[in-house]
Amino acid sequence: MNKPEARGTPVKVSLFSDADHAGNLLTRRSHTGLMIFLNNSLIDWYSKGQATVESSTFGSETIALRTGVDKLQALRYKLYMMGVPIDGACDVFCDNQSVCLTAQKPETRLNKKHNAINYHRIREAAAAQWIRVAFEPGISNLADFLTKILPIGKRKNLLWTLTR
């Protein structure tokens, strides 16, 4: 496969991930929200209901993070094939501390099979060091926009953060 030589200044890729657990009052399905930034510029966003009903916030946040990791992998491949260098690991921000911690611990054991599959996908990316999972408090998580209706104060704060 002929790939172009990497040229130019390396770009920084980051992802904000969030899930609204059981936010749909009719079906109780969760909602995923993702925002992908390239050098602090929003280049992609994703907002969609999840296909399964989750019994825990951990499960819905893990599904959201796995969706984000899949999108990041596709973006990294596109940038790689265009010869755009990437500056280290992609920063992935999530507002659930337990999801962040389990993504970083290889000895974690999960009992639900579908959660374990999503976890291993995230864990493989973290072990390969092409993502770095970090905690982002819910008050400043930009992907919160895409999952639920926010109070006016929080919405203004996130909009201000997004536009600066």
PLM regions and their residue ranges:
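Amphipathic alpha-helical
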Residues: M1-E5
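RNase H-like nuclease fold core
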Residues: R7, K12-F58
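RNase H-like nuclease module associated with reverse transcription
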Residues: K12, A51-R164
